[in-house]
């Protein structure tokens, strides 16, 4: 990582109230190398410039720490982790969390597993599979304190895919861009349908970059009905209470 990239990372983290140590910076620098090399072979990310990766992957991943919603959590699921975001940046700064990085694409999960091992992030567990299937698995259902997602899907889809994984009193932290009123209304109804209530809608700008972001927090307040999640592909094709235009 160049001095400019390091400065951007430090500035972005500082805006989030995080003070990065030399060990943190070393791991982020190694993650940058791993991502750049891996993406050239596996097409892991559309971002290739150091500035974009630092701000729009590393710093953006850390914005789920806003508001302290991860405080007190032990077991956290990153649903739709892709190349490991937000799981890997979170693992670097929060070694107290047991992070499970879930994606349906084997090559991405393999990359996350190799990278976590390379960075000595032993508290990251890779998991390959579909949320619709694993959300019905007794070993996974209602077994997490938090679920984090980053730019995965519309809120009604997220509610159905994520709430089944949460214990009672757990929280979904959905990292998204701007949310329109129709998506928010449908997301509110979908959350209630599957056992949740929206507790916070935190609109902010991405540190340094200035892009609009939203952190939606949903609490698991009731058991998810057994019929959810619906079978594979249905939540995306027929979102609850939502017709995307």
UniProtKB/Swiss-Prot annotation:
GO terms for cellular component: cytosol. GO terms for molecular function: rRNA (guanine-N7-)-methyltransferase activity. Gene3D superfamilies: Vaccinia Virus protein VP39. CDD domains: AdoMet_MTases. S-adenosyl-L-methionine binds at residues 80, 85, 103-105, 131-132, 150. The keyword Transferase applies. Keywords: Cytoplasm, Methyltransferase, rRNA processing, S-adenosyl-L-methionine, Transferase. Pfam families: GidB (PF02527). It comes from the Bacteria. The keyword Lipid biosynthesis does not apply. It is an enzyme of class 2 (transferase). It is found in: Cytoplasm. Its EC number is 2.1.1.-. InterPro entries: rRNA_ssu_MeTfrase_G (IPR003682), SAM-dependent_MTases_sf (IPR029063). Belongs to the methyltransferase superfamily. RNA methyltransferase RsmG family. Specifically methylates the N7 position of a guanine in 16S rRNA. This is Ribosomal RNA small subunit methyltransferase G. It comes from Deinococcus geothermalis (strain DSM 11300 / CIP 105573 / AG-3a).
